[in-house]
Amino acid sequence: MTPREKNLAEIGKIAYKYGFTVEDMLGARRFKKMVAVRRECIAMLRAKGYSTTEIGRIMNKDHSTIVTSLQVLAAQNG
């Protein structure tokens, strides 16, 4: 299993826990609940030491979107 496949499997576990799919996490839809779960996936990848650019590649998002998500999480967690 490649590192990307391992990360997608972990993203899938988080997504499934909330009733979503990996495709939902990698897609462009922005339902409030989906965005919150996507941010949890981003936080998990960041905790594993990935850069914002690497997370962007994994999540099919621009790195600036990843930076914004991490800033929102930091603000929420004080």
Where are these regions (language model features)?
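Short, amphipathic alpha-helical "recognition" segments used to contact nucleic acids or chromatin
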Residues: 34-50
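General nucleic-acid-binding
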Residues: 1-14
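DNA-binding alpha-helical recognition surfaces that contact promoter or target DNA
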Residues: 44, 57, 68
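Short, Lys/Arg-enriched N-terminal segment that forms or immediately precedes the first helix
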Residues: 16-31
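Helix-turn-helix DNA-binding elements, focusing on the entry/boundary residues of the two helices
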Residues: 11, 51-53
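Residue-level detection of the helix-turn-helix DNA-binding "recognition helix"
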Residues: 47, 60, 71-75
